[in-house]
Amino acid sequence: YGVKRETQIVYPKDAAMIGFKLNIRCGSRVIEVGAGSGALTLLFSRLAGPEGQVVSFEKEERHFRNAQKNLDRLGSLKNVSLHQDDVTGYEDEEFDAAFIDVREPWLHMEKVRSLLKAGGLLGTIVPTANQVSDCLRGLQAGFGDIEVMEIMLRYYKINAERLRPQDRMVAHTGYLAFARKIEEIVPPQA
């Protein structure tokens, strides 16, 4: 996208999986916690299309300004609302999907869960296994279908007589966790 970045990047291999696993498509309503430089915001916007909505929050002023510049520079995104704040507002609305890309995503899971519709999808990305463990603890209440993955992508040298992997690859770029909001089943009163 040509995004000027000041934050850790989400690699295309991870971004593609995030869009796929969150099932973001035309008309989707998406919450993003941690806009960073706005690259994923752009992806979510394009996947959701003109009928969709992306509501993005970035608490850090410097990152917010950079994301805003990137979004402005790369065209009119009428389906994006960028807020310099923690996740606030929108309590009376429901979203199809949410993505959290901050240092401690588990601290936002309860709030984000309250904004997801029943069956809504949540994703996170973190760089360390310890953070994955904390995310899993945060997902224990109110989420199911939990998955954790790491995407490895290896390119090959293009030579029909000696097809083999390239000598270098970007291996670990982050751990992705995905889950689905589940509703509590309240037994009927006798």
Where do the protein language model's features map onto the residues?
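Conserved SAM/SAH-binding loop
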Residues: 11, 36-37
